[in-house]
Amino acid sequence: MLQNWNELETACKDCRACGLCETRHHVVFGVGNPKAKVMFVGEGPGETEDLQGEPFVGRAGQYLDKLLAAVDLGRKSNIYIPNIVKCRPPKNRDPLPQEQEACIGWLRNQFALLRPKILVCLGRVAAMKLIKPDIKITKEHGEFLEKNGVLMMATLHPAALLRNPNQKPAAFEDFLKLREKMDQLGCDIAKG
């Protein structure tokens, strides 16, 4: 377990634990405030993220930024965003179980350094890996569950919302619940 962000990111960028390293342009380590008390976890980088080296910078990321801004959150101020896998799966497919396992240590180390009070899983893959393997995201999104002293919630992935705009109001409700929970716990570092 590495004890500081710079060492962890440097080590992660040298990772060759699975085949995804063969086709990556960049390791997409994570973005945000390393003192945040809320961590959003996605599944893995897409093409734009791989090219730029930052999570959620494509169309889905732009929509995520709108959702965040609507509840007074921002990727540079009061949250941190990594992914389950740090390298892009080919053709934007879901990361395979062995790829997730090869990469999960990086996320665990990020989690240990951040020590968030709330973890939000963006989409099915992250929710299945971190909350429970049989989660039904379309039914269980927006519900908080405590696991090892951390409140966890799944929400619909921003890319899924772009494909199914009728689900946007439900996702927005999830973000409102998150904001309310953050205010209850006093865990918004931007507010004090």
Residue spans for each PLM region:
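A polyanion-binding, active-site-adjacent surface
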Residues: 1-192
